[in-house]
Amino acid sequence: AIFDRSWYGRVLVERIEGFCSKTEWSRAYREINEFERVLHDDGAIIVKIWLQITKQEQMARFKKREADPMKNWKITEEDWRNRDKWNAYLKAAEDMFVKTSPEFAPWQVIPANFKWYARVKALDTVCKRLGTALGVK
């Protein structure tokens, strides 16, 4: 199964947007680790990937989307509002990496300013992790 964001919303979006209390999002780190431990113990292979772009690259992508009639539906006022919280999201992501990277399910942060590189690196990361977990060389 592939989960996109999934249970990490509590320690990212909900934390930054104030949708939960500090007690709740702080507790979520433990709950996430416990849940992923259950998945791992039941035989799931967990690969966690974060595609990281720079603030400058995000701006370039936003402007490109706005200018393209085939893609401007992808950019909303909420995207611009969230961009203003870049530093808060970056801090929350850094906390998430530190607090939810057990040996059996570490985060892989991939530089993603160049989409082709990010795609190849993500596929390479998945293949290597699966190979290691399945004992394939």
Features from the language model and the residues they span:
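Beta-rich strand-turn-strand
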Residues: 1-5, 11-13
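NTP-dependent small-molecule kinase module
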Residues: 68, 91-137
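Short, internal active-site loops enriched in acidic
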Residues: 8, 53-58, 112-116
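Loop/turn-to-beta-strand initiation segments
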Residues: 1, 43-47, 106
